[in-house]
């Protein structure tokens, strides 16, 4: 029997995912008390409303996030987002992930998930410090070897303390979606699972939260 492993953070009112971006505002558009007058059988309903930037919680970047002519969320191929064979690369000392840390792994046609353990700092100031990230050479290595989606449990797959974004540029330029702010990767085996991170089909947007998860058969 298959087992599901949740790899996503909970989205809560006011939480900060990325410094400088506003947290989400979650409220009732239609509350239960107000809805009661519309039904004769005692039924009540809540219709929620959320105001947020796309880069909230655990989210997926499509090529449109980086490139004006890249595929947006509505144009992504589901085959690259759901049921993808997965592999986990573990680098837990906080240092950058280089090609040598992935040598010997077959990543072609796979979801490559980078386990750094940085999610332990989620919703603390430390989360935005000197975080683990991929180098440009690691991005080249993954793109050249046919990875089809890449995820990380850190606050950015690039080094956000410099002004360049070579990893986003290389991976999204190769049509490889990126899933950031993941959690729970320590619960996965190195191999032998399938991965899913499917955003809603929104035209004209490059990023949106996902319920990232793994399926263990």
Language model feature labels by segment:
Residues 1-217:
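Active-/binding-site microenvironments in catalytic and ligand-binding cores
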């Amino acid at each position: 029997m298959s087992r599901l492993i949740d790899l996503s953070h909970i989205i809560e009112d006011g939480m900060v995912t990325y410094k400088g971006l506003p947290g989400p505002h979650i409220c009732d558009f239609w509350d239960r008390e107000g809805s009661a007058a519309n039904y004769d059988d005692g039924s009540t309903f809540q219709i929620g409303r959320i105001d947020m930037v796309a880069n909230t919680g655990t989210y997926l970047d499509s090529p449109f996030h980086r490139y004006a002519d890249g595929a947006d969320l509505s144009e992504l191929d589901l085959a690259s987002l759901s049921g993808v064979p997965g592999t986990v690369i573990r680098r837990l000392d906080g240092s950058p992930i280089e090609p040598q840390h992935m040598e010997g792994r077959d990543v072609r046609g796979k979801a490559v998930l980078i386990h750094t353990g940085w999610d332990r700092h989620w919703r603390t100031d430390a989360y935005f410090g000197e975080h683990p990230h991929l180098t440009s050479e690691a991005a080249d290595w993954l793109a050249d070897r046919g990875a089809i989606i890449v995820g990380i449990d850190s606050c950015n797959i690039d080094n956000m303390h410099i002004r360049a974004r070579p990893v986003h540029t290389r991976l999204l330029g190769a049509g490889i979606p990126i899933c950031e702010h993941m959690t729970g990767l320590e619960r996965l085996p190195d191999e032998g699972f399938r991965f899913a991170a499917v955003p809603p089909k929104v035209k004209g947007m490059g990023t949106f939260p996902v319920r990232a998860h793994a399926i263990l058969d």
